[in-house]
From Swiss-Prot:
Primary location recorded for the protein, binned into one broad class: secreted
UniProt-annotated location(s): Secreted
Recorded GO MF terms: toxin activity
UniProt protein name: Snaclec CHH-B subunit alpha
Family the UniProt entry places it in: Belongs to the snaclec family.
Pfam families registered for this protein in UniProt: Lectin_C
PROSITE patterns: C_TYPE_LECTIN_2 (PS50041)
InterPro entries: C-type_lectin-like, C-type_lectin-like/link_sf, C-type_lectin/snaclec_domain, CTDL_fold
Keyword Amino-acid biosynthesis: no
Keyword NADP: no
Top-level taxon of origin: Eukaryota
Amino acid sequence: DLECPSGWSSYDRYCYKPFKQEMTWADAERFCSEQAKGRHLLSVETALEASFVDNVLYANKEYLTRYIWIGLRVQNKGQPCSSIYSENLVDPFDCFMVSRDTRLREWFKVDCEQQHSFICKFTRPRR
């Protein structure tokens, strides 16, 4: 596996980076995806990954907003949550964030138009 770019943290086969800029959920997702192919707002797949990301956020908490966007959102009423990006958000309260104070132990469903810091994730390229 190749290393993560400068400024990005590495765990397993992924790279992570929190950004202090305050954006809406859609703008933050767009920002992540424009950095390079395959980059998106954070999705968490295991408890160990959550613990790693928790430490990344804690190490950067002094310059992040209190709440940080993650990639989780509700797609449609009655459907399961999804971490796949779509601009067709039905309800303005369909986006999720975490608090830097409670770390990843609590997720909050809020208005997608709020502006917060965010964390991007992507799979490291293979050689």
